[in-house]
Amino acid sequence: MSHSVKIYDTCIGCTQCVRACPTDVLEMIPWDGCKAKQIASAPRTEDCVGCKRCESACPTDFLSVRVSLWNETTRSMGLAY
């Protein structure tokens, strides 16, 4: 099952998330919005196993990469009352 992987523009182009991903979901692409001139991209989300190693590796204060697991979304929907 694929998960949703969102890359935010707070990415500093450090490549930590790309190196942490065991299934090569992420890659770096050119981007002029940061000093490193690159940003993480998630072209292969169907390969995401939901381990969230990319999130753990992100050094920014506000995580630049977020993984949303489909079962987390379903579970949290049942908590509203």
From Swiss-Prot:
GO-annotated biological processes = photosynthetic electron transport in photosystem I
Protein's membrane topology: Peripheral membrane protein
A molecular function (GO) held by this record is:
metal ion binding
Binding of [4Fe-4S] cluster 1 occurs at C11, C14, C17, C58
| Annotated 4Fe-4S ferredoxin-type domain residues | 2-31, 39-68
Which GO cellular component terms, listed alphabetically, does the Swiss-Prot or TrEMBL entry include?
Answer: chloroplast thylakoid membrane; photosystem I
Write the protein's name: Photosystem I iron-sulfur center
The entry's localization annotation reads: Plastid, Chloroplast thylakoid membrane
Q: What is its EC number?
A: 1.97.1.12
Q: What is its main location?
A: plastid
What's its catalytic activity? reduced [plastocyanin] + hnu + oxidized [2Fe-2S]-[ferredoxin] = oxidized [plastocyanin] + reduced [2Fe-2S]-[ferredoxin]
Q: Which cofactor does it need?
A: [4Fe-4S] cluster
Query: How are cofactors bound according to the entry's free-text note?
Result: Binds 2 [4Fe-4S] clusters. Cluster 2 is most probably the spectroscopically characterized electron acceptor FA and cluster 1 is most probably FB.
- Name of the top EC class for this enzyme: oxidoreductase
